[in-house]
Design a protein with these regions (language model features):
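Conserved active-site motif detector
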Residues: 1-107
């Protein structure tokens, strides 16, 4: 089964990424009413709320990570991801929601 890796970007506009650690779970929540990006997926962490967004631009996606656009139709309203690396240019995480993997199998 394919594992999806994502870049979490925009942390510098919120709470930074210094508190993020390897293994930390975050929630990915679709934001269809986002005025800037109809495929926006915000990244939340309880109790902080929004800590960033899944990168959706060639300028912000690191390496072979999936963009928000590639990931958007792979899950329902929300799913979870696990942080792998905290880098100067972004945070790398993998999506661990089972529904993402099931939707790929059914295609």
């Amino acid at each position: 089964m394919k594992r999806y890796y994502i870049t979490i970007t925009g942390t510098e506009f919120r709470h930074g990424s210094e508190f993020m650690k390897e293994g930390m779970k975050v929630k990915l929540v679709k934001e269809p009413d986002n005025e800037y990006d109809k495929e926006a997926i915000k990244v939340t962490l309880t109790p902080i709320d929004t800590v960033g967004y899944v990168a959706n631009s060639v300028k912000t996606v690191i390496g072979e990570c999936a963009s928000a656009g590639r990931l958007y139709d792979k899950f329902g309203a929300e799913t979870e991801a696990t942080i792998m690396y905290v880098l100067p240019d972004g945070v790398i995480a993998y999506v661990d929601g089972e529904e993402v993997l099931v939707r790929d199998i059914l295609k």
